């Protein structure tokens, strides 16, 4: 079981750079997006290979989707990882643009 509490503490929203960034054990991951017309378009998720399988990408997607929900945004998942995540999590379907 992954410790997502630790993960949540390492994710930082950088709105000026339009991304969320995670740092864990000196390694990084990020999710990049653009905004327009009430839609957050998630373009890309990238995680350092040293972090693969540790829940970092999922944590980044959750953070981005939670932000979209709080801000009243819909989500267009151009990123294949985000699209797959949303398909597997029905609680996110209402966010689809």
Model segments located where?
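Basic, gly/Ser/Thr/Pro-rich low-complexity segments located predominantly at protein N termini
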Residues: 31, 58-60, 84
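Short, flexible active-site loop motifs that bind/organize anionic cofactors or intermediates
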Residues: 1, 51, 72
